[in-house]
């Protein structure tokens, strides 16, 4: 292995993170901040000559569902920038539901980063027990349900029909490289960091290149984090994020604050997850003002549909300026399937993303100062439309979902409070309570 996590020039960031979507990036940055680190969260790779004053850098990419070759190219670009700026440990942040297909993108990116870093062995775990994601015997559970039996089996872009992560990841690796996937079992993880390190050494000696790691609790992740103290590269969900900073002597902190919130409030929900469906239904059931986007109507005349939504929003805000408004494309699996049947999966998703990005810009230009965006793909396209480059992490709404503050050219005063929610995250009342956390 070339280098180690402890080898870095003085004053440079110790941890460099590559997130495969924007919601996951804010999720990870949130955990690192709460663990005591100073974090720079940047949207895409900064210019080569840009300096950072931080303990950790999180680079947010929109690489989860692009072609594997594009994801690899973007991730390598991020990795090279991070290493150039002195980071000693590289963290590839993936979704806690291991969102991917047989073509990737988790496996191809892991292999490319291992090659780039000359790394002979690494681990991967999507475990995030605080959000109900646990791994046992190499199988991923969402709550008490196998991943393959959860709502993720209906995901329109990355349907997860196999919970065996060893098998899922092995299928994504390049056979020509000969890397094998193994497992660090729960009974080892439950013992100690030293036991985990010993098992990793044994697996590497047996010819294993990547090990899925079981974890059922926060304590399991803490032991794993300690075991990874000198590892150059790792792959994990954001659940592992607050278990790593103590390796450099950081201590937890709850001191987070943002500038005062101003302006109107809006929610854009593009996720079709079970959790976001429930949040939309709860918001509407409790009297919230909401407008549904229909992919078929968007495909027929997107400009007309966007104008219709904006006219509705303007009327609502004339009636009550402080009223939070929800625009959603969220639908049950049957509705999603119907749109896919007529438009195709790619066009159906693209037309909704186009509408959401246009609405994000239009809403902020109309004075929205606090914006919630639900869904990784939706968040990515909206952040790009708003020309956001960096974010400051603020108070947490629910585990994994903080409010952030960002500069945006679309904002009337130059600044915007924004929360990027992974589709699967948040309590059923998330949309109802979110704006109480930003004052």
Predicted feature locations:
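N-terminal basic/disordered segments at the start of proteins
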Residues: 8-52, 73-75, 125-130
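Cap/lid and interdomain-hinge subdomains that line or gate substrate/regulatory clefts
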Residues: 11-14, 71, 79-221, 437-439
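Conserved, well-structured core segments that form the ligand-binding/active-site neighborhood
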Residues: 143-312
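Short acidic, glycine/serine/threonine-rich loops at helix termini
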Residues: 28-30, 102-106, 133-141, 222-227, ...
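General beta-strand structural signal in soluble alpha/beta enzymes
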Residues: 17, 40-42, 90-94, 122-126, ...
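Short glycine-rich or small-residue beta-strand-to-loop segments that form or flank ligand, phosphate
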Residues: 14-19, 57-65, 88-99, 214, ...
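Conserved, well-ordered active-site substructure
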Residues: 368-369, 377-426, 430
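C-terminal structural cap/anchor segments
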Residues: 313-374
């Amino acid at each position: 292995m070339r280098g180690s996590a402890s080898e870095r020039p003085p004053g440079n960031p110790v941890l460099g993170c590559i997130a495969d979507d924007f919601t996951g990036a804010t999720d990870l940055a949130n955990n690192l901040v709460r663990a005591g680190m100073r974090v720079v969260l940047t949207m895409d790779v900064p210019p080569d000559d840009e300096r950072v004053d931080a303990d950790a850098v999180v680079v947010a990419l929109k690489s989860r569902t692009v072609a594997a070759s594009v994801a690899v190219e973007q991730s390598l670009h991020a990795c090279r920038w991070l290493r150039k700026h002195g980071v000693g440990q590289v963290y590839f942040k993936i979704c806690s539901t291991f969102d991917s297909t047989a073509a990737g993108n988790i496996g191809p990116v892991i292999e490319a980063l291992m090659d780039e870093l000359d790394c002979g062995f690494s681990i991967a775990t999507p475990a995030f027990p605080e959000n109900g994601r646990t791994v046992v015997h190499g199988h991923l559970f969402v709550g008490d349900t196998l991943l393959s039996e959860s709502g993720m089996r209906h995901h329109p872009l990355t349907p997860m029909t196999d919970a065996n992560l060893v098998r899922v990841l092995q299928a994504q690796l390049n056979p020509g490289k000969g890397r094998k996937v193994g497992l660090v079992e729960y009974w080892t993880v439950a013992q100690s960091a030293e036991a985990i390190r010993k098992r990793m050494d044994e697996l590497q000696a047996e010819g294993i290149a990547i090990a899925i790691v079981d974890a059922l609790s926060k304590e399991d992740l803490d032991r794993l984090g300690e075991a990874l103290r000198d590892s150059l590269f790792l792959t994990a969900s954001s659940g592992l994020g607050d278990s790593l900073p103590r390796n450099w002597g950081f201590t937890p902190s709850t001191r987070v604050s943002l500038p005062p919130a101003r302006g109107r409030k809006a929610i854009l929900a593009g996720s079709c997850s079970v959790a976001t469906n429930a949040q939309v239904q709860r918001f509407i059931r409790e009297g919230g003002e909401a407008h549904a986007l229909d992919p078929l109507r968007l495909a027929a005349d997107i400009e007309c549909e966007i104008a219709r939504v904006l006219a509705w929003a303007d009327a609502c805000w004339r009636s009550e300026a402080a009223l939070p408004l929800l625009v959603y494309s969220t639908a049950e699996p049957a509705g999603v399937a119907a749109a896919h049947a007529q438009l195709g999966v790619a066009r159906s998703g693209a037309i909704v993303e186009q509408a959401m990005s246009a609405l994000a810009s239009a809403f902020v230009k109309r004075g929205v100062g606090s914006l919630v965006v639900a869904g990784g793909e939706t968040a990515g396209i909206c952040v790009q439309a708003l020309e956001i480059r960096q974010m400051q992490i603020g108070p947490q709404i629910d585990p994994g979902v903080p409010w952030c503050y960002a500069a945006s050219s679309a904002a009337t005063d130059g600044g915007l409070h924004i929360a990027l929610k992974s589709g699967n995250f948040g309590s059923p009342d998330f949309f109802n309570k979110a704006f109480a956390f930003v004052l």
